[in-house]
């Protein structure tokens, strides 16, 4: 089953429902609760740019405090099979779900507080018993398949500890989304049990930069990856993690491989995401898999991670929750 969706912005949804009573549909329809900041058009893009500028170049007096786990939560830095991981667990979990978080960063950076904070939200939305953030090896020191080896080690380590694969959710954003798909493919090819679900946020599905796609069409629109960001000068460079592999090698670019036999997957991206085209292609490639693909109009790369206060980000997290509840009944 392949489900393609387009998120309706909160402002448009409220406006549409507000006129329903006047359109002959009978009973008045209640306007749904909207959570988060609702912005549209130029105001939204100006807000996003301001927030991204502050994230990339924070003033000395406004640098965020170091991550602290919420009161009552367990938080530990440990390792599984010599791979560094960080474990977070809420005080009173009501389900057995375990999230394996594979962070983004172009395979060039390690785990950061941005992901630790996001992990807390992920655990809450997915009703997870615990979440493991994997600090996998990355370029420039390490090349393919170092990150895949580390992700596999942690996954198998969880199974060895007694975690059922049917209780595991693998989440990955950007490069982490690439790694999540690569891990699922590796498990399939080795005959190992699959997790219950994959959640992919703006996955990096193609290592090759291609003109005439969202890589160029959204260059001026994506305030997270595009023009004016620290990533912009490197977008046409050969990713160091690729090593000696050609960029269209299926081991690097999952959009070029067979995705049959993978678990249900949710792919979320933004209408202004630099990686929109390859995410569309990834979803199309997975048409023999139970995949839900949702585009959030006018939103940039990994928006729920970097803009958690916006209504679209909250809606995306709620979609993750509903997706997990559908495929992993409590």
Segments the model singles out, each with a brief description of its role:
Residues 11-19:
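Bacterial N-terminal signal peptides
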Residues 1-11:
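N-terminal Sec-pathway targeting helices
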Residues 19-29:
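Bacterial Sec-dependent signal peptides at the C-terminal "C-region" and cleavage site
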Residues 30-51, 55, 62-330:
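Alpha/beta-hydrolase superfamily serine-hydrolase fold, recognizing
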